[in-house]
Amino acid sequence: MKRLATGSIALTLLLAAAAQAQAPRAPRAPPAPAPRDANGHVSFSGSAKDIGNWEGPANASIFFEITDGKKVSPAASLPTNPSLDDVPFQPWAKELYLKRHASLQADDPHTRCKPSGGPRMFHTPYGLEIVNSPDTNEVFVLAVGAPHSWRVIYTDGRAHPQGFKPSWYGHSVGKWEGDTLVVDSTGYNARAWLTREGVPYTDKLRLTERISRPDHNTLRYEATVDDPGAYTAKWGGGWTLRWSEGNEPFDYLCQENNRDPGRMTGPKGE
C-alpha cells in the first residue's frame, strides 16, 4: 500500500508539472518609456532614483560585422549595417584597415590611452554616460573608463566656428528631430580610429549621428560617415546600447592600469 501511495504522489506531481509547462506564460511587461528632461526632450541620463549607465555591444565589429572573414550579426547591430564589401573604401583606406585589422592593438591609439574619437566612444566596454543639460542647451557624452574623456554637443542653435583647431572629438552641434538628437560634427584631427577594428578616416570627416532612446532600457546609435579623403561615398551603420541599472562611474586611469610596455615603445610609442 505504501508503494502504491508513493507512486500516486509521483504521478500527481508529474501531471502537475506537465500542466504547468503547458500553461501559457504571462506576457512580459513592456519596458518603461524613456524619461524626459525639463524641456520635454527625451533624456539620455539617469536620475537620483535611477542610477545606471549605458553598456555598448560586446562585439568589436560594429559598422560591419566580420570575424575572421565571416559576417556575423550580433543582436546589438542594426539590420541596415553594411558588409565589409559594401563599404566604399578608397584603396589606401582599405589597405590601412586590413593592416590594422590583422594586428589589432599594435597601433591602436587606445593602447597609449588616447581618446576614442567619433563613434568608437559609443562602443566603450567600460560604460557610457550621456547627460542632458536643459539649462545650458548642451548634451555631455562621458566615457567612464579608459582615457576618461568627454565631448560636448551644443543644442543652442550655434554654427560650427570658423578656423576651429582640429581635435580628437571635433566640434559637435545638435538639433532635435522629434525624439531623436541629430548631431553634426566636423573638425577631427584624424588621429583616432572610427571603430575598435581600425576603420580609418581623415581630417575631411563630417560625421552625422542620430541618437534616440526608444524605451527606458535601450539607446539607439546611428552614424553616417562623410569623408571624401578616405571613401568614395557616404556610408554608415549603428547599434544599440543597453541601460545597466545600478552601475555608476568608477575611477579608472588608463595610464596607471597599462601593463603592456612592449606596445608603448618603438616609433608609435610617443
Feature locations, PLM:
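Positively charged n-region of N-terminal signal peptides that target proteins for export
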Residues: M1-L4
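Bacterial N-terminal signal peptides
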Residues: S8-A16
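PEST-like low-complexity, intrinsically disordered acidic/proline/serine-rich tracts
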Residues: Q20-E270
